[in-house]
């Protein structure tokens, strides 16, 4: 555990997440095992370094912290190395030679081996006219070499360094032109001024290098964010394609259900009309029989008439029972079809809402807008088809035509209104025919 604790502060490259800084190694409350707290340096984490109200480490952003099981990142932590962040902020003063010779400041630019930088870094050193008084800036060159591994050279920083060095050269040139061999005090002043200017130049260079590291860090963060967002865009596109396929399948299924529903409705309407016609005809026959019996004031107690009426009554009751059964059956099927249609409509609406919620933000927005427009046009077409089918279903119902004319007097005995007797009708009554010689 100590070897992991010593690596706190190092940077590790986590697969599928990017670069992060190790900031905690140890247990976490309510969780079994050891965990590593990593700051992902961007808002792509799950917390701010705290869990269940307890703070474990500080993060750069509110949602850049992440807890990972130690065994999953142990190999990454062991391979990581703690980067050297300390820099030299001071420089040793230049030694003044005993012969008080003029120190000249010359810039020698040497390219650094940085494959990422398009422009080589610049280093400078101080040389004397005499070889015994030469002093190089090796420490500062080593500082440049430590910083060059981070890449991404800053052009503005180089311009500022060049301006400082050019001012130093001008100052030294003026000092050289104004120097006189017998003025030792002036040489000391010029040497101290050169030393101060060199220190200021070094501080400025280090400040610019810190800015450069900061900019590189920001660029790395943006790159990681883009790498994390790209899979999300890919998932959005795949989800949109799946939703389009589901919508097409639901449209086909909905169209098929509507056709079947229209056919069943037409069939049940025709059957219902036929039953209503038969029932109304039977009711009319019953009324005619009742009126006829009342008009003649004759009891209907004859056995044959009673049996016939009972049979007719039973037939009417059976027909009414069948009618009620068909009516209830039709009502149930109509409710089932309605519920099925409502469920399909709700599912279609839910899929449309889900498609709206999963739209991406960049280049996919135009495709989502076009898909939304197509969905709206499809909904309008579906509404128009429903209205057209409802109108055609009502207008195209067939008129009931019985297969054969119904004889209202079928199965009844003949009755003569002239002589008020049974056995013959009025046209065949012998009392009504004057040419009949049987009666006189």
From Swiss-Prot:
PTM Phosphoserine: at which residues? 95, 110
The subcellular localization recorded is:
Cytoplasm, Cytoskeleton, Microtubule organizing center, Spindle pole body; Cytoplasm, Cytoskeleton, Spindle; Cytoplasm
Sequence motif CCHC-box, location on chain: 416-429
Outline the segment boundaries, as ranges, of region: Disordered. Answer: 108-157
Per the record, the GO terms for biological process are: 2-micrometer plasmid partitioning; cell division; establishment of mitotic spindle orientation; karyogamy involved in conjugation with cellular fusion; microtubule nucleation; mitotic spindle elongation; negative regulation of microtubule polymerization; nuclear migration involved in conjugation with cellular fusion
Basic and acidic residues: compositionally biased ranges: 141-157
Recorded hits in InterPro entries, A to Z, give: CAP-Gly_dom_sf (IPR036859), CAP-Gly_domain (IPR000938)
Q: Give UniProt keywords alphabetically.
A: Cell cycle, Cell division, Coiled coil, Cytoplasm, Cytoskeleton, Microtubule, Mitosis, Phosphoprotein
* Organism superkingdom: Eukaryota
One GO molecular function term of this record is: kinesin binding
> A single Pfam family, by name?
CAP_GLY
Please give the GO cellular component terms listed in this UniProt entry: cell cortex; cell tip; kinetochore; mating projection tip; microtubule associated complex; microtubule plus-end; spindle; spindle microtubule
Q: Which residues form the CAP-Gly domain?
A: 26-69
PANTHER family xrefs: DYNACTIN 1-RELATED MICROTUBULE-BINDING, NUCLEAR FUSION PROTEIN BIK1
Other notes: Present with 300 molecules/cell in log phase SD medium.
> Under which name does UniProt file this protein?
Nuclear fusion protein BIK1
Q: Which organism is it from?
A: Saccharomyces cerevisiae (strain ATCC 204508 / S288c) (Baker's yeast)
């Amino acid at each position: 555990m100590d070897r992991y604790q010593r690596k706190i502060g190092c940077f590790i490259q986590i697969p599928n997440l990017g670069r992060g800084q190790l900031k905690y190694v140890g247990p976490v409350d309510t969780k079994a095992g050891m965990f590593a707290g990593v700051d992902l340096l961007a808002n792509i984490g799950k917390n701010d370094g705290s869990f269940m109200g307890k703070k474990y480490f500080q993060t750069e952003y509110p949602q850049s912290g992440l807890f990972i099981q130690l065994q999953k990142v142990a190999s990454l932590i062991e391979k990581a190395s703690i980067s050297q962040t300390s820099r030299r902020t001071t420089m040793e003063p230049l030694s003044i030679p005993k012969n008080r010779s003029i120190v000249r400041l010359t810039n020698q630019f040497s390219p650094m081996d940085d494959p990422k930088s398009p422009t080589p870094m610049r280093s400078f050193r101080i040389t004397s006219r005499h070889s015994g008084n030469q002093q190089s800036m090796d420490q500062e060159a080593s500082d440049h070499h430590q910083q060059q591994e981070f890449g991404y050279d800053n052009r503005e920083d180089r311009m500022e360094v060049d301006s400082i060095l050019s001012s130093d050269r001008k100052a030294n040139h003026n000092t050289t032109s104004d120097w006189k061999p017998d003025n030792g005090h002036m040489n000391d002043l010029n040497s101290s001024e050169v030393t101060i200017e060199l220190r200021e130049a070094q501080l400025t260079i280090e400040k610019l290098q810190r800015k450069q590291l900061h900019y590189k860090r920001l660029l790395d963060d943006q790159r990681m964010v883009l790498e994390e967002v790209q899979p999300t865009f890919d998932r959005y596109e795949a989800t949109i394609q799946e939703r389009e396929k589901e919508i097409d399948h639901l449209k086909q299924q909905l169209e098929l259900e509507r056709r079947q529903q229209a056919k069943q409705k037409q069939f049940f309407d025709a059957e219902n009309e036929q039953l209503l016609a038969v029932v109304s005809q039977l009711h009319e026959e019953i009324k005619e029989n009742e009126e006829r019996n009342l008009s003649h004031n004759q009891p209907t107690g004859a056995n044959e008439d009673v049996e016939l009426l009972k049979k007719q009554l039973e037939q009417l009751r059976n027909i009414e029972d069948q009618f009620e059964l068909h009516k209830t059956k039709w009502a149930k099927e109509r409710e089932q079809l309605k519920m099925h249609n409502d469920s399909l409509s709700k599912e279609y609406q839910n899929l449309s809402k889900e498609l709206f919620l999963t739209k991406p933000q960049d280049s996919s927005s135009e495709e989502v807008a076009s898909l939304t427009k197509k969905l709206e046009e499809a909904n309008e077409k579906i509404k128009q088809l429903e209205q057209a089918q409802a109108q055609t279903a009502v207008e195209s119902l067939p008129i009931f035509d019985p297969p054969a004319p119904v004889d209202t007097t079928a199965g009844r005995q003949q009755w003569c209104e002239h002589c008020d007797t049974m056995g013959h009708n009025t046209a065949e009554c012998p009392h009504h025919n004057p040419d009949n010689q049987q009666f006189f």
